[in-house]
Amino acid sequence: MELRDNLACALKHLRYLDKKRRLWVDALCINQSDDIEREFQVSRMDRVYISAVRVIVWLGPGSESTQLAVSTLSHLGRQIEVSRWGSMPSPSCAEPSWYHTGSVLPYNDQAWRAIYEFINVSWFERLWVIQEIQLANSNSVVLCGAHEISWRLLHRSLLCLSMKRAIIPENIMQCILKSLSLTLPSREQTLQTSLYQSRFALCSKPVDKIYGILGISPPRFVRQLVPDYRAYYGEAYKTAFLEHAKIVCRFELFGWCSLSQPVMKMPTWVPNFSKVCAPFPLQNRGICYASGFSRCHYSYKPGKVLNVLGLRIATVAAVSQSAIESFTDLFNIFNFIQVEENKNNRYGTGQPLLDAIASTLSCCFLSERFPSMGTSVLSLEELKNAIMTHLGSVIKDKVVEQKLKSLMLHVEGRRLFTTKEGLMGLCQDCALPGK
């Protein structure tokens, strides 16, 4: 049997010298070239990992810096506790302030380099490992050469680092953000959230964007989806969309629909789950759709047409040229709606135009609406001042920059549109003038 170098290296490190050891390795225990066998195994993958005595993650043989990375991350993981609602100091911690987003970690360049080398490996980018480690029990460990760290401690340390975006080296933060799908509690999330969190994860087949997270998907959805590797992946995407809509009675997955990145040979309403630029699900932060959380009404018969009931309230007049991906794009939006020239004008609802712009671009994620967030989010006045102060210029205030980064999470991948009725909103690339 042929083995890839990494697997051969792992087996040599994992074997006992004096007794037999029983391991389950998907690359060996599943015939990857047999689609029928893969379909059967995919549907029971969750039971395999839930039933395991423990899951062992193999990162590779390691390097000279591995020991420093493991000791640094282990110590960091011992300082915090993590729950569904955030992080807090561990009862036995030696550094009670490290959990806080603004707390600077006393690491030198050597330590940061060791951490980067440790997490900058392919395992953290793979799609299938998300459900494997999410379904694993608390005994699970991560091995890198001869060095070991419990997944519990690594999970906590990565979450702690991810919350310090303003003070973590950029190269490390990029690696951490790609690994967030491993550390966030996907088993308790909606399908929409799991798809969003895993959007950067890599897989060999487009259909695995769905099949690869079935183990952590809502049971009602999983029961309706039968893995089929012999069919065109677009059919799996369509089935996933329709079955999910039937269960939740909302079109939550429309965020993956795209005219610029459509699923070939499929209707434009079929989401493209293989694209990585899907926008952030706004309801994750208590932000509603334009229609609130009202039920959708639709009908579908086999074919290409999806009949949807809606209300015609406005006509699109213009759409910003490109999606918002950076602060530069955000400033281009301000030019698109001529903020400087119209800052004293009134919006279609009667409120000041600048208030409407700030509310739209923040999706109303402001301290006035979420007072429990305190100073971690901008107020309407702070955002308006930031817009006018930094219009087309470099943001020098680190506090303002950090808060604007939080705002960017809502608008990334979206475009601004205006209507003939004098209104504005955020949309996908499928909104066209005249619609």
Regions found by a protein language model. Name each.
Residues M1-E81:
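Chitinase-like catalytic core of GlcNAc-active glycosidases
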Residues R22, F40, R47, G62-K435:
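Acidic/Ser/Thr/Pro-rich low-complexity tail/linker regions in eukaryotic proteins
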